[in-house]
Structures are given as C-alpha cells and as structure tokens.
Amino acid sequence: MEVLPRILLFDSGVGGLSIYHKIKKSLPKANYHYYADHMASPYGDKDDEWLDHRINRILIQLDQALTPDIIVLACNTASTLSLESLRSNITTDIVGVVPAIKTASEKYQAETIGLLATPATIEREYIENLTNKYSSNKTIIKVGSTELVALAEEKLHGGEIPDTSLHRIITPFIDANCKHVVLGCTHFPLLKPELQALAPNIHWIDSGEAIANRVQHRLGLSANSGSDKMKPQPETTGSNFYSSAEITDKLQTYIKGIGFTKVKSHYLPCI
C-alpha cells in the first residue's frame, strides 16, 4: 500500500501557511500537520534564550507525537535562531526558511535591495553574515516590523487591513526607490496583494517556491507520489492544524477551506 509522506510545518502563527500553499501545490497528496504557536506570537520580539528553549521543547514533543517524515520550520525568526539546536536534538530531517537574500542578489542587478522582516531577524548575526557573503557590493535597506505580522494574522482572522499602516511600514523602500524587496518573514507573503497594490513598482520576493522544491527533493518524491520509504502512519491520516491558543471561527473556516480536516485550539505539548 502506498504510504504518503507526513509533513509537519511549524510557525509562530499563520505565516507558515504561505509555505504550506507552495508545498501542497508540489505535493498535493501528502498529509500535512501545521502547528501555530499563537500563545507566544509574535516571535520577533521575544528573548532569544527563552524562545529557543520553547521552540525546541515544542518541536521535540511534536516530533515524537506525530512522527513526521520531514519538519519545515516555516518561520524566519525560528529558523535563524533555532535551526542548529533543533538539528542536534531531533533526528527527523528539518528544512529551515531564511530570507531570499542570496536569490535576490544573484538574480537582480539592482544596487539596492530591501529586506522586510521582524526586528529579531533583522538583527540576527545570521542575516549579517548572509548579506556580507552575497550582497557586500549592494546597499541593503532593512525594515523590521512586528506590526506587519499582526496585520497578516488579522487578515486571516477576517479583519480589515488599513492601507495607511502598510504604507507607513514600506515607506523607507519607496523613498529609496528600491525595486526589489525580500520578504523575510513567512507572514508577509500573505499580504503580498496589498503590498503590490500600494507599491506596484516593487518586486516582492519570498522563498516559498524554493522551500517547496527543497522539501520535495529531500523526500525524493514526484508531485503525485508516495513512497514505501515513508514512516508507517496508519492512525492519523489527513491534515491537521494545531494552535497553542484560541483561534477565531473565521480562521477555522479558512483553515478547513485550504485542506485541513481537523483544527485543534489550545494544543500545547508539555514544555
């Protein structure tokens, strides 16, 4: 019998759904489990030591409970902070998500590139090393925002997104005539239609497709296949969404509409 892969995605909230959409397009038959740590969201303003401990404890428990074939750390802040420690604590293959600075620098000849991310990601040494390695000859305009994370969450919870707030956040890119901006938080592609409407001359770059390709490659699968090499998982087929806090009815409706059969709030592994 064909055994389909189980893919676990982890984020502080709904941002990782931007990655989920890309992976599901590549692997539509896979079983997906998504964990949103809404209780501690946003991650971008939390203490590093506290956050690293929390991420490791939750994912160790989820790995044991769900036995995924691969874990996608669908959060830039978590990836730049905890990817190394997670790989030392968990044997399951883990794919991280980092801002597409390398892609933007190599693909576009612009002298100026923007980076829109959370303050924690902006300030991370990992990002400094990334920009020094691939963009040393370019001007990098960095804008850190946790407000944009909240706006993306609000959108999927059914709220209105004020153009004035978005415009204020992206004004540094507009003023600098920046044509290419890397979206360095998985929440931000959820607002790409609004960003494009406000700044149509800016190319907003995210890493969703690259991550989907990497996951497919790591699993060794074609788009519509399973594999007899996957872990047997007869008891929990289907796709499930978990949140560490309460989520609105509108968000639950949205989540079920994109392929998740079960939604569970207040699910917090022992940490």
Task: Enumerate the predicted regions with their spans.
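Non-catalytic structural scaffold of enzyme domains
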Residues: M1-I271
